[in-house]
Amino acid sequence: MASTKAPGPGEKHHSIDAQLRQLVPGKVSEDDKLIEYDALLVDRFLNILQDLHGPSLREFVQECYEVSADYEGKGDTTKLGELGAKLTGLAPADAILVASSILHMLNLANLAEEVQIAHRRRNSKLKKGGFADEGSATTESDIEETLKRLVSEVGKSPEEVFEALKNQTVDLVFTAHPTQSARRSLLQKNARIRNCLTQLNAKDITDDDKQELDEALQREIQAAFRTDEIRRAQPTPQAEMRYGMSYIHETVWKGVPKFLRRVDTALKNIGINERLPYNVSLIRFSSWMGGDRDGNPRVTPEVTRDVCLLARMMAANLYIDQIEELMFELSMWRCNDELRVRAEELHSSSGSKVTKYYIEFWKQIPPNEPYRVILGHVRDKLYNTRERARHLLASGVSEISAESSFTSIEEFLEPLELCYKSLCDCGDKAIADGSLLDLLRQVFTFGLSLVKLDIRQESERHTDVIDAITTHLGIGSYREWPEDKRQEWLLSELRGKRPLLPPDLPQTDEIADVIGAFHVLAELPPDSFGPYIISMATAPSDVLAVELLQRECGVRQPLPVVPLFERLADLQSAPASVERLFSVDWYMDRIKGKQQVMVGYSDSGKDAGRLSAAWQLYRAQEEMAQVAKRYGVKLTLFHGRGGTVGRGGGPTHLAILSQPPDTINGSIRVTVQGEVIEFCFGEEHLCFQTLQRFTAATLEHGMHPPVSPKPEWRKLMDEMAVVATEEYRSVVVKEARFVEYFRSATPETEYGRMNIGSRPAKRRPGGGITTLRAIPWIFSWTQTRFHLPVWLGVGAAFKFAIDKDVRNFQVLKEMYNEWPFFRVTLDLLEMVFAKGDPGIAGLYDELLVAEELKPFGKQLRDKYVETQQLLLQIAGHKDILEGDPFLKQGLVLRNPYITTLNVFQAYTLKRIRDPNFKVTPQPPLSKEFADENKPAGLVKLNPASEYPPGLEDTLILTMKGIAAGMQNTG
């Protein structure tokens, strides 16, 4: 390790690595290679930058880093002005290049951190229970350790653990929430950089390997840098679906059977000598991509139909490959009588069939290879399944009949189960438990649709349709009826037989869209879909309306209807709403003892602040679980968590283990949103860790529940939540000019230019904070590193508790030390403070906010500091993140990059918003764009921008860079 003394005033750093070593603390552990990894990547990049654009640009980028590092080390805000002066006079092409360079270096720092974490995992020196970011978390829930701990420490028998696992289901729901700001092209290049770096540090590497890997590393770094980071068009829902499904194809498909084998091994190690049955739904996958129409007019019935058919095509393709591998493997001739008879029937009925479109096994298979005969027939039906879906996708019709393809999972499983049983009967169970078992598990996990598509729609849209029907029938306006009358009418129609939807119903485009979606549900195979989720649900009639519309549109197997409670008031009334629903006899007959309820973390946090939302979510879950228990209903809670703490994010296993006791009971659904998909499933080892975390934490929560809060803790939380909500709303809702301040002090108005999702940023045009979606709301505050929605109200709540009774300070410390929910809430808040910087937020205020609003910004920054100090006192910490040196080290490494981008963003916003802002032009830096009279190619990438050349792209690059540095977007 280099000396840690500060550089002298005349000392010039020739490598960023030299400056890094002034900043970064010493090794955190013996296997700490973060600085080494980062220096290697950044030095390679700087050499590439110099080769492409000359030494002036390289030197400028290094100087920006050094000024930012000075600010980070000393907190001297004059350095921000110095940096701003350097950045504002850049020529348009140079500005884009500098922003792109810093963004790229930040991405490389993230990759170094990911490789370091994987290195520590391999060395089994993982720090347990840390609070690092989700994707690169050093946090863990190891399935084998969990099983052993449940037996040896908790006192459960191995059989009890086995039974619990057999009855457990974790359903991970991929959503297209627009928070993945990086393009897929760059994500793939980053993956190759990560792999090169990992292999370069392997112990058995030869000199030739090292040279070739080093060349590959430089090639990939340069390819990433030369790729446009900016999406030039908004993605369609179909494109989002393809993006999400690429993870299923690339890591999850093979990852699931690999993980389930590890579960088998873990069970064996606690004395269970049988495998987890293949028909156990330990892990399931669902999707909202192409089904979530809430506030997204681009998700039409046609889009929903397209993504379902596309998913069936993808699934059939994957299965065809697996079946062909299995045909090579199952070359045995011994089989039981049942399989022999089936094989002979299939062989005689196929004639001397030649299928030239197959590469392998294209001629008729002889009867002395019975398993291959059976599997060949399965492959034929899969081929037809794929081609039928392709035809329906292309033209809406297909000559291939449904009968000649697979239409149900049972039909697909039957011949595979026949092969499995036959192998076992003939003494070949070891062979049966190989690739065939893996395939059976894949079929049971993914079905014929790969993922089940959830449908989500806002309750008001259903009200519009029912209102149009009742008005057309001349029985009044459904919209104006009270809840009792709505329920009475809906139930009478549901109990009756008469058709309700008249063919001549006058329909607006919106009504036609809702009805069209139900017709798609009726048209496509039922196994394509998950539940039907109603956002902004408030009453039983919201659920019954969807039940009625499903019946009217001919949905053969109605989707389970799931109310989503997300605003604070809706969460408070959720238990009563669920109880009213369960008191309806017709509905209880319909659900057969099972109900799913979704709770939303994003809108509740935007509505009331993080502390109040977290506590209300906790209480709502507890109370709904009690209601379900009284009515004999198995309740599954669906957690709509985002990636950021402001939207319910945080390390997976900690989030699960801090849920109230008796609310999971072996069954949980969780959204995996935006950038979190890449963090959780971008690599095979990440996929494995993700499946392990969810499975182990869900099992542990059920078999070793967290403590219930003491009555005095509850009372104090109730009181603090009221104070926190009042404080939060006094600023966000009641402060007359808050919206003006928010839009001035953050890049909220420019957010839509990033093209990071198909969904509009607002539910309705115009309006204030209430119409703004939670993602751009959180995104904007994350960009300025102020994170206001996460901490606002918390300090006031703590202060109230301590001022009311000084003994409450000890109660709060006790809550932190003994209650997982409270500890996780505060530790995640501490992580946010570690990433925050009121000095940076102050720069945005200074440059962008009206003079008369600046005192308001100063008040907020004072509250930020006060809240942070109170938090540290309650947690018993002297410094931020003193208990997590790994995350602290990573932040020290990333922050100078982020600060440069923050300053660049603030000054770019100033130039965009204030045409009178004067800048002093600098001579060109890049040798590529030295001719000032020739427009640079970089600037021409965005010819439609309404701003002066280069400003919009520079702004977008800073947004992407800060999102990468925070390791969250929205």
Curated annotation (Swiss-Prot):
Q: In which pathway does it act?
A: Photosynthesis; C4 acid pathway
The UniProt transmembrane annotation reads: none
Record PTM Phosphoserine, positions in chain: 15
Q: Which residues form the active site?
A: 177, 606, 647
Give GO terms: molecular function aspect only: phosphoenolpyruvate carboxylase activity
Per the entry, what modulates this protein's activity?
Answer: By light-reversible phosphorylation.
Q: What is its EC number?
A: 4.1.1.31
EC supergroup of this enzyme: lyase
What Gene Ontology cellular-component terms does the record carry? Answer: cytosol
Record InterPro entries:
PEP_COase (IPR021135), PEP_COase_bac/pln-type (IPR022805), PEP_COase_Lys_AS (IPR018129), PEPCASE_His_AS (IPR033129), Pyrv/PenolPyrv_kinase-like_dom (IPR015813)
Q: Which key words are in the record?
A: Allosteric enzyme, Carbon dioxide fixation, Cytoplasm, Lyase, Magnesium, Phosphoprotein, Photosynthesis
As cofactor, the record names: Mg(2+)
- Write down the chemical reaction(s) this protein catalyses: oxaloacetate + phosphate = phosphoenolpyruvate + hydrogencarbonate
Compartments annotated for it: namely: Cytoplasm
Task: Name any Gene Ontology BP term.
Answer: photosynthesis
Q: Tell me, how does this one assemble?
A: Homotetramer.
Record family assignment = Belongs to the PEPCase type 1 family.
User: What is this protein for, i.e. what is its function?
Assistant: Through the carboxylation of phosphoenolpyruvate (PEP) it forms oxaloacetate, a four-carbon dicarboxylic acid source for the tricarboxylic acid cycle.
What is this protein's record name? Answer: Phosphoenolpyruvate carboxylase 1
Q: Which organism is it from?
A: Zea mays (Maize)
